[in-house]
A protein has these predicted regions:
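Active-site-proximal, Lys/Arg-enriched surface segment
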Residues: 16, 45-126, 227-231
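Short, conserved catalytic/metal-binding motifs centered on acidic residues
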Residues: 25-28, 74-88, 121, 163-168, ...
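Electropositive, glycine- and tryptophan-enriched low-complexity nucleic-acid-binding patches
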Residues: 37-42, 46, 102-160, 241-258, ...
């Protein structure tokens, strides 16, 4: 990457830590000597090798997480989910609408939402959680194929590990791809006992608290009645399915949750405790929207959008490793924000000492 492009990259990263950052080109201009359109050109049309940055980032994350698994003996969790980076639908008169934006079903909002659908992959081990990939779902490739490709590119896990997902990704093909790399699956799933299609809600109607397969389990200080089924499923041999109700909502169809584990040696408690680690990707989405401009960026080209996401993923990684050892994104974010603020104050003090003009001081102060 040329020096000028490296400057643009650092401009974007540093701007993240400014108060009020939204991922808009006007934010980049605050920390750049160049006009905001120059930084936008760097994202949309610049001739730099973004795949090299992505490859280096993925390699660093795999090395860190897999080494932690080897030294600690703890499992690796590959966590996959998707979210929507919402945007306002352009008018029919708009000559340059944002590329690759569509209407998607938002489960959070309970309606169709316009924007970009983001498939994200996190790798986690022994308390270390890093964003491995952020992928644009543009309908040229199915989400199932996107996740299968992720499974294919990951190295074989050095210890027994787990792929955590919701019902969208618990297809037999994806689970097989991950199992080949040493990852069992723990996720949501519609139940197909003994190869016969049957809704989980129908099976749940026959469950009683006194059933020998029902146990009371505590997960994150909440108690659940859980029915355990072990056997063959449609296209899956010998898996565990858990039908779960909150203790106070037993028998309420709306409260029913269904989980699957392809590792039948895990206890009910272990399955639910492992699935709870999937929360880290929801936290990542929230943090990305609040601090990395995931749903506020104003970039029109598909290439520019994917490059922006890559830089934000790199920024997330920097926050998690910036203190010399691993920390949470929030800890690293505020640490770097404080460091940059102290550096700016020091620069202002030195300018004043050397008799700088008011205009020069105001420029540094931003």
């Amino acid at each position: 990457m040329s020096d000028i492009y490296l400057q643009h990259l650092m401009t974007i990263i540093v701007s993240v830590f400014l108060r009020g950052y939204r991922g808009k080109t006007v934010d980049f201009s605050i920390t750049s000597q160049h006009h905001r359109t120059t930084v936008a050109y760097f994202l949309n049309h610049g001739k730099w090798n973004d795949s090299a940055l992505q490859k280096a980032l993925k390699s660093s994350i795999v090395e860190l997480i897999y080494q932690e698994a080897r030294s600690s003996g703890q499992p690796i969790f590959c966590i996959v989910d998707d979210t929507i980076a919402s945007h306002i639908k352009p008018s029919s008169q708009d000559l340059h609408p944002i590329e690759a934006a569509y209407f998607h079903q938002s489960h959070l909002k309970g309606r169709q939402d316009y924007g970009h659908q983001v498939v994200s992959v996190m790798l986690s081990c022994n308390g270390i959680t890093l964003n491995y990939a952020v992928i644009l779902y543009d309908k040229t490739k199915s989400k199932i194929k996107i996740v299968q490709d992720i499974a294919t590119e990951l190295p074989e896990a050095p210890v027994i590990s787990y792929f955590l997902c919701d019902s969208w990704y618990t297809s037999a093909g994806i689970m097989k791809s991950f199992l080949e790399k040493g990852f069992y699956t723990i996720g949501n799933r519609i139940l197909y006992p003994m190869g016969i299609r049957q809704k989980a809600s129908e099976l749940a109607l026959r469950i009683r608290k006194s059933d020998p397969n029902v146990s009371l389990v505590t997960v994150d200080k909440r108690r659940f009645y859980v029915y355990r089924y072990e056997g063959n499923l449609n296209k899956i041999s010998n898996a565990v399915v858990l039908l779960s109700y909150p203790e106070e909502c037993f028998g309420n169809p709306k409260a029913l949750r269904v989980f699957i584990s392809t590792n039948v040696s895990l206890s009910t408690q272990e399955i639910l405790d492992s699935y709870a680690k999937r929360w880290s990707i929801e936290l990542f989405f929230r943090q990305s929207k609040q601090k990395l401009g995931l749903d506020k960026y104003q970039i029109r080209s598909s290439q520019g959008i994917q490059r922006y996401w890559l830089i934000m993923s790199f920024t997330h990684y920097l926050c998690c490793v910036c203190k010399g050892n691993h920390c949470t994104f929030e800890e690293g974010y505020f640490y770097l924000q404080k460091q940059l603020k102290e550096e700016r104050i020091t620069a202002i003090y030195r300018l004043i000492q050397h008799g700088a003009s008011l205009e020069e001081v105001l420029t540094i102060a931003g």
